[in-house]
Regions:
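Active-site-proximal loop/turn and secondary-structure-junction residues that shape catalytic pockets
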Residues: 63-65, 116-118, 145-149, 170-172, ...
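Catalytic cores of alpha/beta
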Residues: 149-156, 212-226, 282-293
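An N-cap/entry alpha-helix motif that binds or orients negatively charged groups
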Residues: 20-57
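Auxiliary Fe-S-binding modules of radical SAM enzymes
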Residues: 1-34, 103, 227-352
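Conserved, mostly hydrophobic/aromatic
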Residues: 18, 45, 73, 112, ...
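Glycine-rich, proline-tolerant flexible connector loops at the mouths of alpha/beta enzymes
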Residues: 60-63, 83, 111-122, 174, ...
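Core AdoMet radical
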Residues: 80-96, 102-123, 128-193, 202-209, ...
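Canonical Radical SAM [4Fe-4S] cluster-binding loop centered on the CxxxCxxC motif
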Residues: 53-93
Length: 352
């Protein structure tokens, strides 16, 4: 045990210094995770985060614009084949009202997230982006609306979108095909990510921790992919089963493994924008604080209208107590301060 721990610590030291390991070395770190090793990685990750970002934590206002989706991902509560999902689609006026409320609360980044819905066509999305940028020129607009053509991504970028989040979900093609039906393509997902980066978006990828059929090897491949792709953002959170999906009976991912991987991601890329996600706060009450203590530096409170928050149910038990809401920025500030960080009102672009 002692020898394995020493080897693992040496790998973490090397990752801290060189920001790169082999897939086999990442796999070793994942297989030998322990409380002691996670604490060791977290201490180094927080030190690196402080070198780049100080104690600043950036806030993003999340606007869940609709839960209608053409896709049928096996893990997702808003999948097309879920008849139990209470569908909604926000109007342009509702979306702009969310942004106005967020701006008044101090948000300078808005994240428009939703299912792949043909009603939110390229033209509609471009119009929304232009409206928000015209009213709030000092704000960043992030989109998280799934897969489009390169031309569509270019049009949204030209309309003023700054960032795009598209979780890759897994860097292993065989694993991807176990999480998604045959109509969905691993190669197309990767094409989208390359196009986004090439166009000039600040690009975010990410994956679920503990998803069905995930192994130490596939996770190691995720870390290597992120090391090589160099995204501006990376969103990871525990897999949480949703009762109306084919994966309802699979166990959830753990907070412990998620925060350990957050630390490794910070060591891989010290300037990464790394959220402590809502899923982490769902799986344990202090999950987001644990994420910040492991190296995260972004939180994404919910600006969606209260009436729809429960409907955007990607997984069961989603935090909808009010504490995760943007309106409770005071509570959030105190929680962030409790772990030695501070929320800042800023666009929160990546520091290069």
């Amino acid at each position: 045990m002692c020898r394995a721990m020493n080897k693992a610590k040496q790998l973490i030291d090397r990752l801290e210094a060189q920001h790169s390991l082999s897939i086999e070395e990442y796999e070793y770190l994942i297989e030998n995770q322990s409380d002691e090793l996670a604490a060791y990685a977290a201490e180094k990750a927080v030190a690196l985060r402080k070198q780049v970002y100080g104690t600043d934590v950036y806030i993003r206002g999340l606007i869940e614009i609709g839960n209608i989706c053409r896709n049928n991902c096996y893990y997702c509560g808003i999948r097309r084949s879920n008849p139990a999902c209470d569908r909604y689609r926000l109007t342009e006026a509702q979306i702009l009202d969310c942004a106005r409320e967020g701006y008044a609360l101090g948000f300078r980044t808005f994240v428009m997230q939703g299912g792949e819905d043909s009603a939110f066509s390229v033209d509609v999305v471009c119009h929304l982006v232009r409206q928000i940028k015209a009213e709030f020129p000092d704000c960043a607009v992030t989109l998280s609306l799934g897969e489009f053509s390169r031309e569509a991504y270019q049009a949204m970028f030209d309309a003023g979108a700054d960032r795009y989040l598209l979780r890759h979900e897994t860097a292993n093609k065989a694993h991807y095909e176990k999480l998604h039906p045959a109509q969905m393509s691993f190669d197309n997902r990767m094409r989208c990510l390359r196009d986004l980066k090439d166009i000039g978006y600040q690009t975010g990828c990410g994956f679920m921790v503990g998803s069905p059929y995930q192994t130490a090897r596939t996770l190691a491949e995720d870390l290597k992919f992120i090391e090589e792709f160099r995204p501006e953002m990376c969103g990871i959170g525990p897999f949480i089963p949703q009762k109306d999906t084919p994966f309802r009976d699979f166990p959830a991912g753990t907070c412990e493994q998620t925060v350990y991987l957050l630390s490794l991601l910070r060591l891989i890329q010290p300037n990464l924008l790394l959220p402590a996600t809502t899923a982490l706060g769902t799986i344990r009450p202090d999950g987001r604080e644990r994420g910040l203590q492991a190296g995260a530096n972004v939180v994404m409170p919910n600006l969606s209208p209260l009436g729809v928050r429960k409907k955007y149910a990607l997984y069961d038990g989603k935090l909808c107590t009010g504490e995760e809401a943007a309106q409770c920025i005071g509570c959030l500030s105190r929680r962030v301060a409790s772990v030695g960080c501070r929320i800042v009102t800023a666009r929160g672009d990546i520091i290069r």
